[in-house]
């Protein structure tokens, strides 16, 4: 009891949704970072989860009810930050498609990503110098198809 106020356990509520890792063959097993941010872009909570074969996720939060953004980021995808209005009843952000091509992980798709991808061009898993982050389609090799993905999303930045 503090000045007549009794502090009790903070209720946990869930944010649910689905992540689709754009242009990638195997979403299952990929790590996603989720940040709950307020209107001032202050990070309230951070958690990580591993995608299953459906991409479905549940993020528990102790944040009070209100409007937030749930910033979702995976390794070589730029972040997306849908609005979520916490009401205490399993609030959903629906399906969020993350944009592929951020080879260097800086949340923007730029010439530096082309440079990193070029360093692994024509290499496959197990080859010396292979950068798994440059394998944008997840087929185990860095090919022209990875360049196409990067080119289609060039000059985009995450939220």
Regions of interest found by a model, annotated:
Residues 1-9:
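Surface beta-loop-beta hairpin patches that serve as ligand-binding interfaces in beta-rich domains
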Residues 8-159:
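Cellulosome-associated attachment modules in secreted, modular CAZymes
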């Amino acid at each position: 009891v503090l000045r007549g106020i009794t502090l009790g356990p903070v209720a946990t509520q869930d944010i649910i949704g689905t992540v689709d890792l754009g242009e990638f063959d195997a979403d299952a097993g990929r790590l996603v970072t989720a940040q709950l941010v307020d209107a001032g872009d202050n990070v309230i909570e951070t958690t990580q989860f591993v995608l299953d074969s459906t991409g479905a996720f549940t993020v528990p939060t102790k944040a009070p009810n209100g409007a937030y953004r749930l910033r979702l980021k995976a390794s070589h995808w730029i972040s997306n930050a849908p609005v979520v209005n916490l009401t205490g009843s399993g609030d959903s952000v629906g399906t969020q498609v993350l944009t592929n091509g951020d080879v260097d992980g800086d949340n923007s798709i730029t010439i530096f990503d082309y440079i990193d991808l070029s360093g692994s061009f024509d290499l496959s898993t197990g080859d010396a110098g292979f950068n798994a982050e440059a394998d944008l389609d997840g087929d185990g090799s860095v090919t022209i198809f990875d360049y196409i993905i990067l080119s289609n999303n060039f000059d985009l930045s995450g939220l």
